[in-house]
């Protein structure tokens, strides 16, 4: 049962200094334009640190003050999105909600009920909720929820129209550094995306059509299981021996998707894994990692042979290698991955949030004990995230409810059952 929550206040946090007239309009890139209209949600759970002298009111004031300060650099986040073309950087402000939770933090993060996590967010991030249609123009919103034990949940929704996961991490790192009054704060760059990937005229935003009967579960691969999977590749072809742990976990889950799809449907379509790829380091010259926006594309791998997960690692690596200079040049001409996704196929999508540093986000009262996202109403979608100690990996898998129950016992045996839910 979801804990009772009481909203205490709601206000708009504006930049501490007005945005100059020369920066009043932020153009979307065409990589932004082709993204579905939704928000990326993240929730950070912080325990009550006994050595912290800050009470709830002081923490709240520090968060609001530092947010106002950092918005002078992240000024589009305080504006409003114009349909699918630009952001009006008018300093309207970031919705900032405060709530009291009538339960303990330990109860909230133990055996997490993923469907109940939305209550820690400022609003429903995906279409389908009662209020979701009213928030499309808001780039950023924050909700602070305080537990009876003194613990805190910080829920953030950032519009996918102007940010990818790395952009979210860049903003949160700058916010935490500002909150602690650090001097070495990462400066964002909002211009590179639209300059190198110019917007297209009259391009409609793809409509987010929620799938029905979708469930999301969190599965955890601990360090030992990841090492065992890597050892299984030792006898494989040379090109897959040095695969990353992300590629290995994607291959393992893709194999499950393939088996479930074949068991349920008699399909002749291609079985395709789509991996989100950060383009910043693949640009020539490379973009700084602080470049804001959706500086990303998708790499597509087709399953030719799939007797074992090791057969799928090679195609995954090959698809990533194809995201080279020539591919980027095609993207700059306006060619997008949507052209590929229009082909008949069974598509399984993967996005890695690993190594983005979410467990290092410290506002001045310690690091989070849990980092979560929420249910995405879209089937065959996977988010990969670090575990708290960063030596394991969480897979947040979204599937049709009946298909989730078809995951094999071999797959389930790979997981840390103390954390899967």
UniProtKB/Swiss-Prot annotation:
Active-site positions on this chain: 160, 362
Chain ranges passing through the membrane: none
GO-annotated molecular function: acyltransferase activity, transferring groups other than amino-acyl groups; oxidoreductase activity
Pathway involvement of the protein, from the record: Alkaloid biosynthesis
Documented EC number(s): 2.3.1.323
GO biological process, one term: alkaloid metabolic process
Keyword annotations from UniProtKB, A to Z: Acyltransferase, Alkaloid metabolism, Transferase
Summary of the function given for this chain in its UniProt record: Component of iboga and aspidosperma monoterpenoid indole alkaloids (MIAs, e.g. tabersonine and catharanthine) biosynthesis pathway from 19E-geissoschizine. Acetyltransferase that catalyzes the formation of O-acetylstemmadenine from stemmadenine.
Subunit structure: Monomer.
Description of the deletion phenotype: Abnormal presence of stemmadenine, but normal accumulation of catharanthine and vindoline.
Similarity section: Belongs to the plant acyltransferase family.
Name used for this protein in its record: Stemmadenine O-acetyltransferase
Region (Disordered): 1-21
Catalysed conversion reaction: 15alpha-stemmadenine + acetyl-CoA = O-acetyl-15alpha-stemmadenine + CoA
Pfam families: Transferase
Coiled coil, from the record: none
Tissue specificity as recorded in UniProt: Expressed in leaf epidermis.
UniProt xrefs under Gene3D superfamilies: Chloramphenicol acetyltransferase-like domain
